[in-house]
Amino acid sequence: MNIAVVGLSHKTAPVEVREKLSIQEAKIEEALTHLKGYPHIEEVAVISTCNRLEIYAVVTDTEKGVVEITQFLSEIGHIPLSYLRRYLFTLLHQDAVRHLLRVAAGLESLVLGEGQILAQVKTTHKLSQKYKGIGRLLDRLFKQAITAGKRVRSETNIGTGAVSISSAAVELAITKVDDLATRNISIIGAGKMACLLVKHLVAKGATSITIVNRSQRRAEELAKKFPQAELTLVSLDEMMSVVGKSHLVFTSTGATEPILHQDNLREVVSAEQGLMLFDISVPRNVATNVQDLEIVEAYNVDDLKAVVAQNHASRRQMALEAEGLLEEEVEAFELWWRSLETVPTISCLRTKVESIREQELEKALSRLGTEFAEKHQEVIEALTRGIVNKILHEPMVQLRAQQDIEARQRCLQSLQMLFDLEIEIEKQFS
């Protein structure tokens, strides 16, 4: 059994590739069921955010398991394998463990140290439990990752004042306009990202903000959090009318297809006013063809990289502090995993050797007869037990210390074969 992660992120793939592989929460159960149907995948969990899709799996055969995950990604994204492979990364064993801990800590985020990813890792864990995607190994790994993420945020300052995707989008907007207070601004969507957009827009002086959302209740819940902002709430039916009156539009919905495109924008945007679009959704809410309209400027999540570059520079030292904490958590998981694998074999070997010792001791004592004093029997008992312990001690220490997973498994298999040990493999992972 080995742990592998196959995926892509803002570091390896552009948004036009990431959006094809985005898996909405409503589709997670189907994805987990599909993946667990492959012959070499025992456990699986899926992290899907605007900046990454990562599939963590416990595989019975590393190479074949990775091929199965890659095939799955090709199928759901309708992307040829030859094209997809250039954007994927694959990490195995301890590298996969370390990567998940880094993700949970915000060290792999576009915005270094951002806090939203930890909540997303928690959601992945809960959904994987709910839909029976994970077993003992990944359950422990995700718990370790959540612990690591919490430690990094409580024991370092990396999360203090960290920008988010939403705040980065607002910062980008500020570089494009002189004064937010003089602009009509609309936000399409009323989820967590939209809430953060309102927070940062209000902080930067925006006074005219309209929320466009399908659910009136969700929009009202958002507005209650900002009573001082006097937000205007409208239904999705009025979206294009609102967009036509706006100077800046931020989109943050769960739509799987673009909701703004060249045809519907051309009808409502005036040449005198123009329009700036900031799309922080993946899949994108704004079609690429809007760039053909001279009166429209459109930006997506990949355009935020320049904005967050300064954030990375100022947080590198804090990231180094976080790395040390993460290594402690990686080692804690590795120790647990090593014990999980080695304990059944060691226990079985000790039981077998002890049985042999007792049998041979009994034979020897029976030959010596009843005249052999009881105190002498105790000495021989201690002697044989000491010999067994001395012989087994060093091999067991070396086995537990073996950090290379495949080498450790080869050692275990050799022990099981050489001593004819009957190990129930399921006990190690059940």
Swiss-Prot record:
Organism field: Crocosphaera subtropica (strain ATCC 51142 / BH68)
Subunit structure: Homodimer.
Listed name of the protein: Glutamyl-tRNA reductase
Gene: hemA
PROSITE patterns: GLUTR
Biological pathway: Porphyrin-containing compound metabolism; protoporphyrin-IX biosynthesis; 5-aminolevulinate from L-glutamyl-tRNA(Glu): step 1/2; Porphyrin-containing compound metabolism; chlorophyll biosynthesis
Molecular-function annotations in GO: glutamyl-tRNA reductase activity; NADP binding
Single Gene Ontology BP annotation: protoporphyrinogen IX biosynthetic process
NCBIfam families xrefs: hemA, PRK00045.1-3
Enzyme Commission identifier(s): 1.2.1.70
Binding annotation for NADP(+): G189, A190, G191, K192, M193, A194
